[in-house]
């Protein structure tokens, strides 16, 4: 087996599109490489933060992951809590981790709105 590791970075903007303040408490990622190997990652917050977002406010962060294949996918969810202490999940739609032919990361061409 190869010891080669592919390192991907991604930038995510989380926007509160609701009408009340909400805080991002935890994350849950499902990372799948092109061979079908699945890794789940769970933890509190994102990049060491648990941002509190007022309606219309955004929080942007960058992070990364490693795969043993040159392509893969990520999807998951954020656990959030509103101003009344009620928790809710925000689904993160699947996105592709991929190298282009020159070996550089592929740009993310689209923005996704999470409700």
Language-model region placement:
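Short, solvent-exposed loop/turn segments enriched in Ser/Thr/Gly
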Residues: 5-11, 74
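Asparagine-centered strand-capping/turn motif at beta-strand->loop junctions
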Residues: 13-19
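Short acidic, flexible loop segments centered on an aromatic residue
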Residues: 20-39, 80
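Polysaccharide-binding surfaces and accessory modules of carbohydrate-active proteins
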Residues: 22, 39-51, 88-89, 110-114
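Short, surface-exposed linear segments at secondary-structure transitions and domain or protein termini
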Residues: 33-36, 48-58, 97-107
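Intrinsically disordered, low-complexity Pro/Gly/Ser/Thr-rich segments with frequent PxxP/GP/PP motifs
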Residues: 39-71
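Terminal connector regions
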Residues: 66-115
């Amino acid at each position: 087996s190869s010891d080669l590791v592919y390192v991907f970075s991604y930038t995510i903007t989380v926007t509160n599109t609701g009408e009340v303040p909400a805080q991002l408490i935890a994350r849950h990622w499902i990372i799948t490489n092109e061979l079908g190997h699945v890794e789940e990652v769970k933890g509190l917050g994102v990049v060491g933060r648990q941002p509190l977002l007022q309606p219309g406010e955004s929080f942007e962060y960058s992070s990364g992951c490693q795969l043993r294949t040159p392509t893969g996918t990520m999807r998951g969810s954020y656990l959030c809590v509103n101003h009344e202490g009620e928790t809710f999940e925000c689904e993160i739609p699947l996105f592709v981790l991929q190298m282009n032919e020159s070996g550089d990361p592929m740009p993310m061409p689209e923005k996704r709105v999470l409700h």
